[in-house]
């Protein structure tokens, strides 16, 4: 059901019909068609007739409902006409902190931070710094409609912006990439020609009630107002994704991980270490390159996994960091043999059941909250996460295949606010009730029916998990260049339950099997972690080992094998065997 918003300007009063769940940008586009300006960058809005207006483009990215606007509300527009005849008609931005570098603009109950100092000074991931400098324009060849030479350009061959919807549709790209989404928002909210103010384009949703509201009433649950309570929530499929693709550096990484199920029939959980790189199959895309899967302490079962305390997690992270890799996600198996004795497995996850269960959705959301994405384009310095969740299960033809996912920013916000929990149906999430510490607003989800019409449904008491899910693609490289050696397999950690033990005997056997004389066997993540736990090598010697693995300089290998610590290791191995 649409609402009508009224806009009063010096040219008259105009009525604009709007969908309550539509982006406010659509409302502004209708308004611009009625007044004598063409650029939203020059439009200012206020909810009071005699107050100075605020930049309208700062409200883009919010829905009409989130801005607290209702049917019949009046907003006051000020701007400089296209003729430029009246300079006094332009309203300057003012904030609650005049003569300072930052403040906020507000309409309804939404407050949007502004600053004159530009983006925040934070340390982003290298891939973000690279893609930030890339315009990401989609080049197009000359067409039969072009009437110019090879060096000319027209509307039929000019480059498209990386967020172009038609390009995504034609190339079957389901989600916009994170940096394409960021550039689109930045284009809407910040003018390239106006450096006097800056609005952070990214803002995480917040569905938690403000327990320390200062509007003069008692704290919740004894008092509540429109300033401290979250707005109604409408869940929709997220149109962008933080990571577009997951690439396993080599197929042996996956095969070694699945071997536990092949030998025992129990499920397995692992943490994926790697890095993020640009992904050229999607405009301004990002891929997670998985170099190793570490298996933390766990108790596997036929239909689940019980995680145990991971005492050396910080040590594993430190070794990975020295090698230039870090946690990029988690992976787990959900495999059941088909019983046909031909290597096939049951297909349990499909469109008629679920792709991630409700508990897995909650786990993914908590992991993403724990591994936040650092960005300079958010007022808080972070926005969502690049942490991925991969499940290895059966495909439609009984094959074993990985599938990679993330959950939406709405899922993260719902978990932060403790609004959702699991239910007895794996494909549905339960909406909690309000209590003394938790206020649950109206929650709905919106989808298109078979006629292409938008239908909104009440999410209480349960709603489908698919509205919080973001799917990624995954693959193995055609010409793999892994960081770690794939020909030598050291015993993987925490597999004692089926007689695979990490001990000095395993180290001796592993090193003796390397006859290359080039130290290739040292380039194994599981071996490095175990060797660190033995404390045989000194700190400088272990750093030398990591430098050799990272840079593959033969001189470093020679210095390592001639070091006192390495000599001690060889002596201990000879005596232990």
Swiss-Prot record:
It is found in: Cytoplasm, Perinuclear region; Endoplasmic reticulum membrane; Nucleus membrane. PROSITE patterns: MPN. It is a peripheral membrane protein. Residues 246-383 form the MPN domain. Disulfide bonds: none annotated. GO terms for cellular component: Cdc48p-Npl4p-Vms1p AAA ATPase complex; Doa10p ubiquitin ligase complex; Hrd1p ubiquitin ligase ERAD-L complex; nuclear membrane; perinuclear region of cytoplasm; replisome; RQC complex; VCP-NPL4-UFD1 AAA ATPase complex. It comes from the Eukaryota. Keywords: Cytoplasm, Endoplasmic reticulum, Membrane, mRNA transport, Nucleus, Protein transport, Translocation, Transport. SUPFAM superfamilies: Ubiquitin-like (SSF54236). InterPro entries: MPN, Npl4, NPL4_C, NPL4_Zn-bd_put, Ubiquitin-like_domsf. Belongs to the NPL4 family. Involved in the import of nuclear-targeted proteins into the nucleus and the export of poly(A) RNA out of the nucleus. Has a role in the endoplasmic reticulum-associated degradation (ERAD) pathway. This is Nuclear protein localization protein 4. It comes from Scheffersomyces stipitis (strain ATCC 58785 / CBS 6054 / NBRC 10063 / NRRL Y-11545) (Yeast). The gene is NPL4.
């Amino acid at each position: 059901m649409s609402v009508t918003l009224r806009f009063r300007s010096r040219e008259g009063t105009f009525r604009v019909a709007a969908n309550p769940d539509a982006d406010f940008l659509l409302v502004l586009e209708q308004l611009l068609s009625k007044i004598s300006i063409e650029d939203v960058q020059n439009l200012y809005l206020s909810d009071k007739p005699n107050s100075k207006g605020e930049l309208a483009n700062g409200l883009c990215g919010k829905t009409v409902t989130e801005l607290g606007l209702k049917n019949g509300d009046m907003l006051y527009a000020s701007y400089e006409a296209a003729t430029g005849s009246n300079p006094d008609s332009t309203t300057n931005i003012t904030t609650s902190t005049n003569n300072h570098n930052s403040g906020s603009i507000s309409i309804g109950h939404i407050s949007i931070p502004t600053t004159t100092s530009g983006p925040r000074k934070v340390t982003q991931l290298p891939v973000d710094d690279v893609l930030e400098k890339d315009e990401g324009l989609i080049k197009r060849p000359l067409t039969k409609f072009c009437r110019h030479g090879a060096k000319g350009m027209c509307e039929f061959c000019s480059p498209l912006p990386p967020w172009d919807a038609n390009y995504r549709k034609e190339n079957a790209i389901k989600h916009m990439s994170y940096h394409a989404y960021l550039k689109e928002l930045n284009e809407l909210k910040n003018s390239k020609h106006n450096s006097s103010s800056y609005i952070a384009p990214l803002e995480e949703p917040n569905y938690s009630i403000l327990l320390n509201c200062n509007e003069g009433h008692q704290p919740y649950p004894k008092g509540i107002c429109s300033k401290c309570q979250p707005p109604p929530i409408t869940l929709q499929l997220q149109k962008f994704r933080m990571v577009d693709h997951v690439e396993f550096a080599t197929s042996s990484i996956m095969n070694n991980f699945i071997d536990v199920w092949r030998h025992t029939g129990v499920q397995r959980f692992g943490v994926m270490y790697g890095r993020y790189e640009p992904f050229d199959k999607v405009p301004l895309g990002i891929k997670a390159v998985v170099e190793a899967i570490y298996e933390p302490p766990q108790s596997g079962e036929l239909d689940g996994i019980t995680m145990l305390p991971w005492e050396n997690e910080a040590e594993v992270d430190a070794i990975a960091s020295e090698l230039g890799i870090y946690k990029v996600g988690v992976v787990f198996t959900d495999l059941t043999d088909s019983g046909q004795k031909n290597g096939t497995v049951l297909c349990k996850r499909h469109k008629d059941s679920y792709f991630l269960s409700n508990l897995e959705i909650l786990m993914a959301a908590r992991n993403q909250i724990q591994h936040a994405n650092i960005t300079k384009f958010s007022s808080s310095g972070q926005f969502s996460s690049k942490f991925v969740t991969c499940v290895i299960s059966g495909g439609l033809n009984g094959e074993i295949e990985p599938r990679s996912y993330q959950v939406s920013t709405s899922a993260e916000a719902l978990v932060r606010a403790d609004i959702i929990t699991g239910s007895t149906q794996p494909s549905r999430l339960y909406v909690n009730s309000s209590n003394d510490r938790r206020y649950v607003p109206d929650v709905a989800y919106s989808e298109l029916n078979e006629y292409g019409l938008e239908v909104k449904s009440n999410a209480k008491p349960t709603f489908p998990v698919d509205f919080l899910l973001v799917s990624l693609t995954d693959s193995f490289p055609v010409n793999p260049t892994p960081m770690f050696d794939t020909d030598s397999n050291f015993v993987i950690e925490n597999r004692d339950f089926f007689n695979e033990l990490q001990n000095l005997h395993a180290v001796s056997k592993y090193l003796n099997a390397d006859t290359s004389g080039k130290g290739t066997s040292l380039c194994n993540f599981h071996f490095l972690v175990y060797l660190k736990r033995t404390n045989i090598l000194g700190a400088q010697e272990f750093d030398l080992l990591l430098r050799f693995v990272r840079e593959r300089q033969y001189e470093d290998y020679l210095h390592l094998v001639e070091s006192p610590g390495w000599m001690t290791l060889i002596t201990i191995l000879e005596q232990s065997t």
